[in-house]
């Protein structure tokens, strides 16, 4: 089924409120159908993900818990994430869904590289009113540990000079080598250029810290820097503190998978749900004072904070190796290979 046929189905469904039971049923139906799942079934789940990301950010937790339960067959072993009181599903600004769908279509056509997909997804945030940003900020407090973490001052910049002093085998030395060997930017993006300090609390702290600690999370939580694991760590981050950019990004991913062979959707949902559950069942990493842990071995840090490595359902480099096998893999590789470094990211 082509994009023009699926778009009206998406538009009709995304404006109809999803209850958690609806999401669970949708995910369960997709799981049971496997590679025979229809494009209509897959776009319905993408609509649920988009609704949570853009219209009901406080419902991201219950939406993904329901998705994981429907897909995996059992509940997340963590306390439910509550929703905000008196916060109904919002109304989409005129033009939002047309812009969102154009990103999906261009991604499907292979027109977007890592920089472009980051910029286009970030630009969707420009459609959202100030009230939405305030709602995202309030929703962050629904996640364990976030209210406490956000009491801290904005963290100082890390430097390669400091990391170079860390002993061999330490987290800081691994972080240093990852940045240098791959010519990554140390803090991913320039926090000052993005104006992160002007965001409402706790988004100022959360967005500054995750840009700074993104690769520390990769190392500590056991995610590699491959295309598939960038998708996975997006779900992990979302489970940890409701990262709205990740929610928006994954909704686009789901829509792209609805327009490609169903076997790609199976890999995608296995990856998203396993990483979401991993994030939900991992203690809040936003509470870690990373600066004081840099000289310590990674295994000790994991043990002290009760952090288990990601239980990956597929080899981390699956997309890189399968790029010539499926249309979905080819599209996803161009979209997600180091997407978080591609350019200006949405500050929410």
Where are these regions (language model features)?
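Context-gated lysine
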Residues: 7, 28-31, 36, 111, ...
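Core of folded catalytic or high-affinity ligand/protein-binding domains
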Residues: 47-309
């Amino acid at each position: 089924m082509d994009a023009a046929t699926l778009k009206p189905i998406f538009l009709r469904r995304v404006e109809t409120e999803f209850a958690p039971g609806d999401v669970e049923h949708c995910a369960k139906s997709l799981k049971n159908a496997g590679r025979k799942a229809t494009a209509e079934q897959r776009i319905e789940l993408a609509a649920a993900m988009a609704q949570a990301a853009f219209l009901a950010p406080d419902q991201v937790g219950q939406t993904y818990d329901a998705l994981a339960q429907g897909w995996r067959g059992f509940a997340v072993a963590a306390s439910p994430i509550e929703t905000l009181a008196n916060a109904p599903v919002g109304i989409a600004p005129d033009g939002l869904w047309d812009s969102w769908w154009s990103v999906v279509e261009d991604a499907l056509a292979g027109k977007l590289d890592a920089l472009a997909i980051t910029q286009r997804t970030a630009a969707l945030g420009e459609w959202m009113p100030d009230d939405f940003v305030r709602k995202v900020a309030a929703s962050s407090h629904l996640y364990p540990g976030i209210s406490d973490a956000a009491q801290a001052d904005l963290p100082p910049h890390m430097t390669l000079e400091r990391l170079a002093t860390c002993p061999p085998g330490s987290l800081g030395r691994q972080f240093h080598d990852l940045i240098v060997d791959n010519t990554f930017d140390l803090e991913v993006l320039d926090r000052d250029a993005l104006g992160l300090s002007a965001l409402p609390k706790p988004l100022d702290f959360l967005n500054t810290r995750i840009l700074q600690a993104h690769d520390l999370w990769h190392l500590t939580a056991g995610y590699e820097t491959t295309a598939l694991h960038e998708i996975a760590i997006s779900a992990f981050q979302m489970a940890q503190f409701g990262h709205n950019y990740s929610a928006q990004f994954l909704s686009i991913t789901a829509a792209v998978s609805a327009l490609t062979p169903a076997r790609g959707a199976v890999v995608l949902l296995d990856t998203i749900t396993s990483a979401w559950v991993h994030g939900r069942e991992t203690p809040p990493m936003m509470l870690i004072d990373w600066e004081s842990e840099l000289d310590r071995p990674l295994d000790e840090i994991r043990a002290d904070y009760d952090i288990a490595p990601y239980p990956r359902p597929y080899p981390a480099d699956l997309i890189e190796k399968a790029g010539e096998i499926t249309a979905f893999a080819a599209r996803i590789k161009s979209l997600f290979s180091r997407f978080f470094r591609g350019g200006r990211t949405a500050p929410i």
